[in-house]
């Protein structure tokens, strides 16, 4: 936690606690912004063992505020990996059977090149000098990481939310390298409503007087208040009205009566403030700007002449899409439109809509129906791939 609070830079940005793959000037990353990023690095974690045929590799793609620590203790927060409930020895994604890879996306803040990383041209953090990063840029970098392992074809690519966008981009850009794909709680484009919520968050960050045009590391104080407010606003979209009512209702926080002031009278107010305060301990404000922008720019149909089915033309990848009934960030109709496009493209696709009131974040929680869907799809794909149980 102190690694992000203290000093002028984030140590994890340049020298992460996880393995890191560095690319020099001879291997630049081509960006959609029309520039080349060089040098750059990718921080990652792996679990399990790659088999001799290199056919058992699963790539896990993280969401907006996630990282590579999917199934191990996070070195910054000290908390368990964000999907340890799903991934590990003997779990649904069994690391005794599969080789699991998860990388921090380009633009992130836990070891892959991002705005908190040192710009070799200046010796200072990039800040806003880093070109805007897209979902496709993230996937291009991941593809270079997969090449490093000598893996020609991934057995499965899976992820939720922004991770699901990466899954779709993988299946579209590199269909020959993806045997199966599992996009969860996601969409093929970001809606105007979602862009609006992101813009509120970005403006909260940029309105913080400590932001200094993104050069806050040089001033020794980060825009924590703005980032906390951005997180509070975003966190509401990850939940559902039913879940909020069940957990908080209009219950008061550590008091028996209203204070007639502006302290956190209600439990929900206290909860959101806590979410904001803990978030700034583990995430970089500029990375938040970059990550939200990458999601806003994502529009798979627009990248293929306006017809989503053309993004998957001729694909032989097996797909399973999962949505949640109470997810109003990426509602079920978003997944259905992807399923319709895959059907039009002649792809092998299944679709699971899970009844739950836990909202968008259900994909990160202990959700038995989700686990059953993943288990069934992975098992079927493994048999088709010829992977032994």
From Swiss-Prot:
Single GO cellular component term: cytoplasm
Species whose genome carries this gene: Mesorhizobium japonicum (strain LMG 29417 / CECT 9101 / MAFF 303099)
EC number: 2.3.1.31
Primary location class: cytoplasm
Protein known as: Homoserine O-acetyltransferase
Pathway in which the depicted protein is active: Amino-acid biosynthesis; L-methionine biosynthesis via de novo pathway; O-acetyl-L-homoserine from L-homoserine: step 1/1
Gene Ontology biological process terms from the UniProt entry: homoserine metabolic process; methionine biosynthetic process
InterPro entries linked: AB_hydrolase_1, AB_hydrolase_fold, HAT_MetX-like
Function of the molecule: Transfers an acetyl group from acetyl-CoA to L-homoserine, forming acetyl-L-homoserine.
Quaternary context: Homodimer.
One protein family per Pfam: Abhydrolase_1
Localization per record: Cytoplasm
Domain AB hydrolase-1, residue spans: 56-366
HAMAP family referenced in this protein's UniProt entry, alphabetically: MetX_acyltransf (MF_00296)
Reactions accelerated catalytically: L-homoserine + acetyl-CoA = O-acetyl-L-homoserine + CoA
GO molecular function annotations of the record: homoserine O-acetyltransferase activity
Active site: 161, 327, 360
Residues where substrate binds: 231, 361
Family per record: Belongs to the AB hydrolase superfamily. MetX family.
Ranges of compositional bias, category Polar residues: 8-18
Region (Disordered): 1-21
Keywords, comma-separated and alphabetical: Acyltransferase, Amino-acid biosynthesis, Cytoplasm, Methionine biosynthesis, Transferase
């Amino acid at each position: 936690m102190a690694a992000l609070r203290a000093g002028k830079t984030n140590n994890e940005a340049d020298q992460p606690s996880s393995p890191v793959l560095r690319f020099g000037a001879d291997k630049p990353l081509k960006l959609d912004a029309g520039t080349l990023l060089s040098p750059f690095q990718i921080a990652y974690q792996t679990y399990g063992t790659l088999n001799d045929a290199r056919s058992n590799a699963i790539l896990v793609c993280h969401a907006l505020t996630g990282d590579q620590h999917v199934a191990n203790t996070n070195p910054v927060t000290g908390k368990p990996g964000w999907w340890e409930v799903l991934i590990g020895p003997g779990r649904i994604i069994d690391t005794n059977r599969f080789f699991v890879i998860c990388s921090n996306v380009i633009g992130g803040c836990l070891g892959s090149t991002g705005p908190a990383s040192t710009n070799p041209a200046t010796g200072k953090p990039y800040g806003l000098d880093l070109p805007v990063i897209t979902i496709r840029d993230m996937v291009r970098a991941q593809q270079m990481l997969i090449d490093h392992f000598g893996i020609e074809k991934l057995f499965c690519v899976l992820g939720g939310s922004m991770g699901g966008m990466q899954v779709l981009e993988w299946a579209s850009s590199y269909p020959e390298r993806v045997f199966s794909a599992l996009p969860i709680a996601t969409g093929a484009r970001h809606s105007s409503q979602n862009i609006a919520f992101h813009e509120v968050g970005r403006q909260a960050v940029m309105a913080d007087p400590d932001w200094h045009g993104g050069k806050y590391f040089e001033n020794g104080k980060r825009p924590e208040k703005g980032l906390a407010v951005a997180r509070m606003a975003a966190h509401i979209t990850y939940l559902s009205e039913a879940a909020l009512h069940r957990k908080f209702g209009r219950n008061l926080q550590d008091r028996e009566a209203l204070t007639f002031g502006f302290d956190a009278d209600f439990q929900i107010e206290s909860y959101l403030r806590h979410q904001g305060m803990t978030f700034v301990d583990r995430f970089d404000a500029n990375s938040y700007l970059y990550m939200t922008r990458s999601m806003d720019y994502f529009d798979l149909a627009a990248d293929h002449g306006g017809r989503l089915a053309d993004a998957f033309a001729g694909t032989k990848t097996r797909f399973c899409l999962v949505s949640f009934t109470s997810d109003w960030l990426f509602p079920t109709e978003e997944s259905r439109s992807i399923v319709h496009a895959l059907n039009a493209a002649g792809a092998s696709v299944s679709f699971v809509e899970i009844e739950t009131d836990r909202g968008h974040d259900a994909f990160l929680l202990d959700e038995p129906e989700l686990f059953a869907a993943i288990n069934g799809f992975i098992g079927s794909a493994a048999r088709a791939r010829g992977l032994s149980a």
